[in-house]
A protein has these predicted regions:
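Active-site regions of metal-assisted phosphoester/phosphodiester hydrolases
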Residues: 1-130
Length: 130
């Protein structure tokens, strides 16, 4: 997991990029660790947690994060929410969670040659307003 703190007009936005493991025990540990980090009261301001959660059904990570954060409903923005594998997506493994005073304006899946070369997932791109 990576965290970047971005200054947006004097306000800190905390962006967490995750790539959780494929093994259930590994993902369970990572989910609990992620939930602890997100709940840290010393990290004030809005948070976005996004990336490859390796969960296509409601699992532990989804359950833990849904109690603390809002989840982006991709069906509002696109017909197909699938992001893996990139060439012919059949699974919805990539998610965006957020809290604070954030608004999601638009989300799209980039389907380009460059995106297919860069990753085995198709990227989700979100326009977010603070």
């Amino acid at each position: 997991m990576q965290r970047a703190d971005v200054d947006v007009n004097g306000r800190l936005l905390h962006v967490y990029n995750v790539h959780l493991g494929t093994a259930i025990l590994e993902r369970r540990y990572q989910a609990q660790r992620l939930a602890t980090l997100v709940a840290d009261r010393h990290v004030t301001g809005p948070k976005i947690i996004l990336g490859d959660f390796n969960e296509w059904m409601r699992g532990l990570t989804t359950t833990l994060l849904s109690t603390k954060l809002k989840s982006v409903d991709l069906s509002q923005y696109m017909k197909r929410r699938r992001t893996y594998p990139g060439l012919f997506p059949v699974l919805h493994l990539d998610h965006i969670y957020y809290d604070g005073d954030l608004e999601i304006d638009h989300i799209e899946v980039l389907r380009s040659r460059r995106a297919l070369i860069a990753s085995d997932h198709v990227p989700l791109v979100a326009d977010i307003r603070i």
